[in-house]
Amino acid sequence: YHKIVLEDVMRAAKGVKDADQLFYQELSALLQPMTDAMYSLEAGMGHTPLFNDSGDNVARSMLSLLAALREEFSIAPVNKNAFPDAGYYCLRHQGLKILMDAGEIAPDYMPGHGHCDGLSFEVSVNQHPVFVNSGTGQYQGSLRGYFRSTRAHNTVVIEGEEQSECWGEHRVARRISQVSGDCGADWIHGEMVTATGRQQKRMILVDDQKVIVKDQVTGSAQGYLHLAPDYEYEEQ
């Protein structure tokens, strides 16, 4: 949706440029921060990160949007690691990139596209996805509930309960709260309280050639990790 809206703003700005310079300037001012967010979150991941109702093959590609931004508006992306308003945090180490969601499930006024992906993460190596969320395999129908569920994401189910109560296909009742996050050169930290009041904290660290994930929860927990296609795991 971010990329769809970014293209809409670009088209609107081009359309009003000759007729309304003030409106053109207002629209143009949105382009740089939107470009920075798109690039910072997606570059190095090898795909659109699969948080909430995200997916590939819906909006135009990041590369095509960057080309248009450069040609039409002379805009180049600025890489950032923290987006506290949206709750996304990035960690980069050589060819490794980790992206974690430490934000609210969705805007309060429109939570229907939100998933139970609090403190979930994705990992890519040399632009190849390794750990991914399950995405939006079905937008309507019997599988919609699974794709929005906690277990469909790289996070923790506490006491068998969902992080937030997803009603129907595009509704959310009680939801996560007290969500916060932060990041440094080799770590990402996030914490939150689930809909039923259980506290969850997560720290992701990069140590040499290892990615260490530390979880702290109130109650018993089951962790879920989803490998990208063509990858297998081995317990050691």
Place the predicted regions along the sequence by residue.
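Carbohydrate-active enzyme catalytic cores, enriched for enzymes
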Residues: 1-132, 182-187
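Non-catalytic C-terminal accessory modules of carbohydrate-active enzymes
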Residues: 78-236
